[in-house]
Amino acid sequence: MSEAEPGSVRVLLFAALSDQAGWQERTMPLAAQPVTALQVWQALGLGPWSSSLRVAINQTLVEPDHLVQPGDELAFLPPFTGG
C-alpha cells in the first residue's frame, strides 16, 4: 500500500463506489485546512452524500464532518449488507 504524500490524503473507494468512480485509490492534495471528510468527497465529484454511506479515517469509522489531516487515509464505504 502506498502512503499519502506530505500535505495530501490517501482516498480509498470500495465495492460499488469504486465501480461508479472508475478508481479504487487516489492521492488528493489538501489545498485548504481545515477540511472535512465530506468536503473531500465533494471535491472528488463523487455525487451527493447519502446517509447510508460510511467513512473511515485511518481505519476508524467517523462522521462525515470529521476533520481530515494531511497524511490521513480516508476510506469511503457503501452501505453494509448481510446478516
Label the model's feature ranges.
Residues 1-82:
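Ubiquitin-like/PB1-type beta-grasp interaction modules and other compact soluble beta-rich domains
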